[in-house]
């Protein structure tokens, strides 16, 4: 972390799928949650922007997710990117994904618990409304362009195996 300088253009997005037990089970390694928490605290202490990336799976009570959101806000992260775990064929475990009705109900229950709280999400209100089942959208390459070491991530990459484009122009032109 000492190799970087805080900037409004640099955000550390830390993967945390819920509370200690749930996250460590999700990544199949005990102790990862505590390491993530210490990294988050260190980065915030040094003045960096920090967000959390959280995926929700089956059998997660909204109350537990609400406690996680409270904890994330207490840590001082800028926001949480939250989404349901979408089913995809190559996943090593197939029985953990939320069905459409389960996903809608979980997010409706969660948002109800969040009324009056100061939870900060790293997504638009349109997307959050979609999670609660109040909107439908199609996948688009411009909806949430993401670039990582593999290239430009195509939308619905998990659902249809689209993968990545090597350039932004390729992402826009090749995505159907």
What are these regions (language model features)?
Residues 6-141, 149-150, 154, 159, ...:
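Radical SAM enzyme [4Fe-4S]-AdoMet core and its adjacent flexible, acidic
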Residues 164-176:
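Short, solvent-exposed cationic patches
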Residues 2-4:
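Short amphipathic alpha-helix with an adjacent loop that forms part of the alpha/beta core around
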């Amino acid at each position: 972390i000492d190799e970087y300088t805080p900037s409004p253009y640099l955000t550390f997005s830390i993967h945390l799928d819920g509370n200690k037990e749930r996250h460590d089970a999700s990544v199949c390694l005990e102790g990862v949650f505590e390491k993530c928490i210490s990294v988050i605290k260190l980065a915030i202490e040094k003045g960096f922007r920090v967000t959390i990336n959280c995926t929700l799976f089956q059998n997660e009570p909204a109350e537990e997710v609400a406690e996680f959101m409270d904890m994330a806000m207490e840590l001082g992260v800028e926001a949480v990117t939250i989404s349901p775990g979408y089913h995809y064929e190559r996943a090593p475990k197939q029985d953990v994904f939320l069905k459409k009705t389960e996903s809608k109900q979980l997010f409706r229950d969660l948002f109800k618990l969040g009324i009056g709280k100061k939870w900060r999400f790293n997504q638009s209100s349109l997307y959050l409304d979609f999670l609660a089942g109040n909107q439908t959208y199609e996948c688009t390459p411009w909806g949430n362009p993401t670039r990582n070491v593999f290239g430009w991530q195509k939308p619905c990459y998990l659902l249809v195996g689209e993968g990545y484009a090597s350039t932004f122009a390729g992402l826009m032109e090749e995505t159907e």
